Amino acid sequence: MDRAELGAALRDYAYLEGDFVLRSGRRSRYYLDKYRFETVPELLGPLGELIAETVSEHEPDAVRLAGPELGAVALAAAASLSSGLPFLLVRKEAKEYGTANRLEGVFQTGERVCLVEDVVTSAGAAIEAVEALREAGLEVGTAVCVVDREEGGADALARAGVRLRALFRPTELLELSKSAAKPHG
């Protein structure tokens, strides 16, 4: 599946129109349902390959990937399988049992990590993940997301010293597919 076919399939599977409240609290007339594309092997595999290629091109010094729970874990795993780079799971908060870790996986202080994200709007969750990785002594300079909604997330990440590399943007997804968006509900 080439990039254009992947974008068209992504839109066909995950682009919904309606009235939605986003994680950021903003309202939107469209929604990209990440679980509709992260749970379909025909999309998850090619997305993992494209994320791996993007990491190789834009963050070649990365020795590890990191995916925030819950949404980006499947993407980080797919990119890990494609790239051969191990990955970390970034919890929203440290668990209160077992090892009490916020980061799951093995790593060494000072390693360069590339953050993998699903859909970026304001980048609030991505910045929280970057902060957790940095607090653990890891270096983060790049984040790769499937879709940048172009609503300030790239600028917010830049202020945190992280470059955002998006595989797709909403306007591009709309141009790649001729089929009608699925109504929500």
Question: Which ranges hold each PLM region?
Answer:
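PRPP-associated nucleotide enzymes
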Residues: 1-116, 120-185
